[in-house]
Curated annotation (Swiss-Prot):
NCBIfam families found in the cross-reference section: TruB
Molecular function as annotated in GO: RNA binding; tRNA pseudouridine(55) synthase activity
Family matches, as CDD domains: PseudoU_synth_EcTruB
Name of this chain's protein: tRNA pseudouridine synthase B
Gene behind this protein: truB
Organism: Verminephrobacter eiseniae (strain EF01-2)
Length: 331
C-alpha cells in the first residue's frame, strides 16, 4: 500500500480494467487510489460507489478504459446482504446511532411472511434516497447535510428489483438475521431496501453487512484483492488487467477494414449491411484493436466514444501475456 511518506512514483500510461474485490472499511476512491499507486497509472476511475461497509466487485478503469466506465455504472448489480431485524439506525446501517429497538415476534419472520414481502419488493419499486448518501442537492452531497443535522425533502426514485430472495440465517448466538440476495438496477440503495423490508415485516431493520457479487456480468470469482495485487512483482501487476473491451461484452461487435477504421476514428459515419443496434463495439481488423463504441441506425454506423490514435498505439504496444493473478478467466 502507499507508504505514509507518500513516496512519489513515476506515472505511466496504463490502459485496462482491474476487477477488484474491494475490502471492508475502504471507500471506493481509497481503493482506487491504492490500485492506481500499485500500477503507477496516470489516469483512473471507478465504476460506481461501494460504501466502506461493503465489499466485493468494483471494476476499476485505467486510461482509455475510463471512457467506458459509464457502461458499468448503468449495469445491473447483484448483492448479498445481512439485515438485522428489530433495530433501526440513523444511517440505515451498522455505522449509525440506534434510533429504536423492538422485540421481534417470530410470526413477523415466518416463511409465508418473508415470501409475501419478497413479492412486494420484486419488480419496479419506489425508493426514497437516504440522507447518508452521495446524491447531490444544490451541489452538495446529502451526507454533508445529514452530518450537520439537516434533513431535506427528497423525491422518491424509481428502481427495479430484478430478483430478490429473503431467508433467515444465524448472525450471532441467539440472533436471527435476514439474508437478502438481490439483483437490481442502477440507483438502488441496499440500505434503504433493508430498511423498507424491515418496515414491511413490522419490526424494522438495518443493514449489517453487504457484498457485491456481480456487476454487469462480472462475477466476484474473477476479482483480485488489493493484498494479492500488492504481493505480485511489479512487472506482473499489469498482466492482471482486463482489456478495455471487457466492459463491452454486451455490445454488438463490428470489425472495420483499415480504410473504414481510419475514417471512423476521424468521426465519420460508415455504411454497411448491419442491423440497427443501440450499442456497438467497433474494432479495426489490421491491426486488431478496439476503436471505440457507437450505434447503428438505418445501416449507418455512428461513432459515440472513440479512442485516440495514441491510446490505441499504447494498448497495442503494452499488451502483456496474461498471467495467473489468482482469478478465473472468463470463457
Amino acid at each position: 500500500m502507499p507508504p505514509a511518506s507518500r513516496t512519489r512514483v513515476q506515472r505511466r500510461p496504463v490502459h485496462g480494467v482491474l476487477l477488484l474485490d474491494k475490502p471492508l472499511a475502504l471507500s471506493s476512491n481509497q481503493a482506487l487510489q491504492k490500485a492506481k499507486w500499485l500500477l503507477r497509472a496516470e489516469k483512473a476511475g471507478h465504476t460506481g460507489t461501494l460504501d466502506p461497509l461493503a465489499t466485493g466487485v468494483l471494476p476499476l478503469c485505467f486510461g482509455a478504459a475510463t471512457k467506458f466506465s459509464q457502461l458499468q455504472l448503468d449495469a445491473p448489480k447483484t448483492y448479498e446482504a445481512i439485515a438485522l431485524p428489530g433495530v433501526t439506525t440513523s444511517t440505515g446501517d451498522a455505522e449509525g446511532a440506534v434510533l429504536q429497538r423492538c422485540a421481534v415476534d417470530p410470526a413477523q419472520l415466518a416463511p409465508e411472511r418473508l415470501s409475501a414481502v419478497q413479492r412486494q419488493f420484486t419488480g419496479p419499486i419506489s425508493q426514497l434516497p437516504p440522507m447518508h448518501s452521495a446524491l447531490k442537492k444544490d451541489g452538495r452531497a446529502l451526507y454533508t447535510y445529514a452530518r450537520a443535522g439537516i434533513a431535506l425533502e427528497r423525491a422518491a426514485r424509481a428502481v427495479v428489483i430484478h430478483a430478490l430472495e429473503l431467508s433467515l440465517v444465524q448472525h450471532a448466538p441467539a440472533q436471527t438475521a435476514i439474508k437478502i440476495a438481490v439483483t437490481c438496477s442502477k440507483g438502488c440503495y441496499i440500505r434503504t431496501l433493508a430498511e423498507d423490508i424491515g418496515a414491511a415485516l413490522g419490526c424494522g431493520a438495518h443493514l449489517s453487512a453487504l457484498r457485491r457479487t456481480d456487476s454487469g456480468g462480472i462475477g466476484i470469482e474473477r476479482c483480485i484483492s488489493l493484498e494479492r495485487l500488492q504481493a505480485l512483482p511489479e512487472a506482473e501487476r499489469l498482466a492482471c488487467l482486463q482489456p478495455p473491451q471487457s466492459l463491452l461484452t454486451r455490445h454488438l461487435r463490428v470489425t472495420l477494414d483499415s480504410d473504414n477504421a481510419a475514417r471512423f476514428l476521424s468521426g465519420l459515419p460508415r455504411r454497411g449491411a448491419w442491423p440497427d443496434a443501440p450499442a456497438v463495439a467497433v474494432f479495426g481488423a489490421d491491426p486488431p484493436a478496439l476503436l471505440g463504441v457507437g450505434h447503428i441506425a438505418g445501416g449507418c454506423l455512428l461513432p459515440d466514444r472513440l479512442l485516440s490514435a495514441l491510446e490505441i498505439a499504447q494498448i497495442l504496444a503494452s499488451q502483456p501475456q496474461r498471467q495467473d493473478c489468482g482469478i478465473l478467466e472468463e470463457t
